[in-house]
């Protein structure tokens, strides 16, 4: 899937020590210069922000993250701290947050595990173990149950074929197996859905979806909706959507985080921060195409203050 890339790029003429001094000045003494903080951090990429953190420590003798935490608050703080966190560690912290304490943020677990590639999943597993002294799979198993648990464990294994290889006979077989596992029988063989959707490569699955439609006269999404339910259904749909068009999947996540009354800030922040350097140029285009309004206008209407300012920069301007 060709993407245009992210809105946040490496700043040219970058000087970590100068940036560190600007940030210190913005936080020193009474009050905080939020605009200066946004001006530096929203216009540097993740790697550069790590260099700034190092320079801050070596030239000022303080921890930039601790200073930011004490100076900032609420959603604006969450965005800035997210931007200051290395990519894989940010995913890991979000997964942990989704399972910590009472209740589970199923949407967060699905979003991260269904959209990351096997190499990213491998690094997530490694980092999770280092951070928390136990495996991601262990925490998933103690926090979820039934088929939802099984699909998450399967995604956590990171066993998806990464090639482009296509075997027409296997495409037909998989499509037929999916049809027989759901639409054609009474009851559903959920494991069959899980094993095909979690292991095959993207090119193969796109052909399976076409063949499935030919056999059953239905989109695979329609069948998943009628054959499964709850978080298991959400997870399978997320996998299919990510295979078809990942930026459109994230556009939908953003739309749902803001539509109606109230805002799901944790989802809004996570998607804006984690996709800023990857496909944030593609997400607004898909948002506009599907919902008829710009992502920029949605964010503008749903947020305020410095929180709004920084998100609009990550969004990349009004399309």
From Swiss-Prot:
Protein name as catalogued: Annexin A4
Subcellular location: Zymogen granule membrane
Single GO molecular function: phosphatidylserine binding
SUPFAM superfamilies for the chain: Annexin
Cited InterPro entries: Annexin, Annexin_repeat, Annexin_repeat_CS, Annexin_sf, ANX4
Domain of life: Eukaryota
Residues modified to Phosphoserine: 12
Extra information: Seems to bind one calcium ion with high affinity.
Gene that this sequence comes from: Anxa4
GO biological process: epithelial cell differentiation; exocytosis; negative regulation of interleukin-8 production; Notch signaling pathway; regulation of transcription by RNA polymerase II
Coiled-coil regions listed: none
N6-acetyllysine: residues carrying this PTM: 213, 293, 300
List of residues that carry Phosphothreonine: 7
Membrane topology, as annotated: Peripheral membrane protein
Keyword terms: Acetylation, Annexin, Calcium, Calcium/phospholipid-binding, Cytoplasmic vesicle, Membrane, Phosphoprotein, Repeat
């Amino acid at each position: 899937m060709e993407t245009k890339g992210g809105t946040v790029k490496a700043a040219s003429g970058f000087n970590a020590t100068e940036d560190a001094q600007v940030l210190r000045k913005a936080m020193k003494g009474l009050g905080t210069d939020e605009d200066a903080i946004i001006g530096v951090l929203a216009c540097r990429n993740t790697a550069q922000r790590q260099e700034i953190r190092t320079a801050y420590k070596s030239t000022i003798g303080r921890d930039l993250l601790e200073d930011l935490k004490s100076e900032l608050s609420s959603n604006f703080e969450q965005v800035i701290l997210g931007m200051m966190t290395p990519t894989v560690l940010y995913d890991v912290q979000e997964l942990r947050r989704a399972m910590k304490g009472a209740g589970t943020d199923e949407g967060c677990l699905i979003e991260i595990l269904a959209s990351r590639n096997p190499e990213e999943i491998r690094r997530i597993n490694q980092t999770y173990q280092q951070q928390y002294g136990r495996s991601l799979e262990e925490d998933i198993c103690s926090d979820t149950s039934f088929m939802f648990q099984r699909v998450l464990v399967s995604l956590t294994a990171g066993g998806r074929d990464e090639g482009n290889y296509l075997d027409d006979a296997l495409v037909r077989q998989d499509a037929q197996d999916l049809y027989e596992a759901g639409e054609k029988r009474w009851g559903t063989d959920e494991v069959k859905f899980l094993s095909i959707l979690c292991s095959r490569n993207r090119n193969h699955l796109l052909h399976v979806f076409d063949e499935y439609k030919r056999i059953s006269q239905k989109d695979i999404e329609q069948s998943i909706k009628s054959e499964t339910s709850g978080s298991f259904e959400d997870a399978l749909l997320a996998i299919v959507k990510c295979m078809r068009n990942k930026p459109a999947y994230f556009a939908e996540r953003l739309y749902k985080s803001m539509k109606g009354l109230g805002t799901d800030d944790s989802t809004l922040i996570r998607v804006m921060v984690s996709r800023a350097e990857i496909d944030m140029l593609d997400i607004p285009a898909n948002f506009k195409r599907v919902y008829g309004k710009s992502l920029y206008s949605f964010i503008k209407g749903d947020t305020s203050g410095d929180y709004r300012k920084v998100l609009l920069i990550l969004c990349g301007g009004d399309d």
